[in-house]
Amino acid sequence: MEKMKAKHIPRIDIHDRIELKNALPLRTPYVIYIDPCDTCNFRCKFCPSGNLELMKKTRGRGHGPMDFEMYKGIIDSLQEFPDPVRVIRLYKEGEPLVNPRFADMVRYAKASPKVQRVDTTTNASLLTPERSLEIIDAGLDRINISVEGINADQYRDFSGHKMDYQQFVDNIAFFYDHKKQCEMNIKINGDILTPEQEEEFYRTFGNITDGINVERTIEYWPKYNDMKVGFDEGVSLLGGAANPVY
């Protein structure tokens, strides 16, 4: 492997990390996830958000970009906590940059005395130079970029998205060149790569990011598909009646 600027680090943010067992009970949450948009412009094979038919059947999904006034209310409500929240994570199920006011969301959170850091995870397909400058100037502390292939054909096959791959790489390089305070990390699913393609991934992105990583999937629940597990949508995780609020 050729020498590169980036360090091999996971996308998990371990900034100022404290073991939870030594901090309980918490006075204030360490991390709060807020989904700027619960829909995505990709149709990745591994992700439920890319399955349009499934999302149509799923209660509470398909709202699109979060209303900015609702978002402001969430950030304002953090005043009720005694301490600042360590991280506001602007990412959950959808693609954050589908929300046209993403930079405003970053800026509003960073202006709050109850927020220490703001980060996000994105597929970066909408990360144009103009939006990059907006997001950086808003004060984003960390951006994780999920790469889904090493060429346009692989992207189209894996994520159902047609793109100008070289422009995609150039846009990421632009963000890196102008990132100021923002820490940058790029990762890819190594299960879709040959050893030669993995080397190409490092050559392409290894000098335009702070951190880089090839992730591997593991079997989280062995033999799950062989188990006969009943599921009742009317029952909550705690055993009571499920009463979704939309």
Question: Where on the chain are the PLM-derived regions?
Answer:
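Accessory C-terminal segments flanking Radical SAM cores
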Residues: 2-15, 19, 24-35, 197-203, ...
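Conserved alpha-helical substructure of the radical SAM core
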Residues: 2-142, 154-157, 162, 166
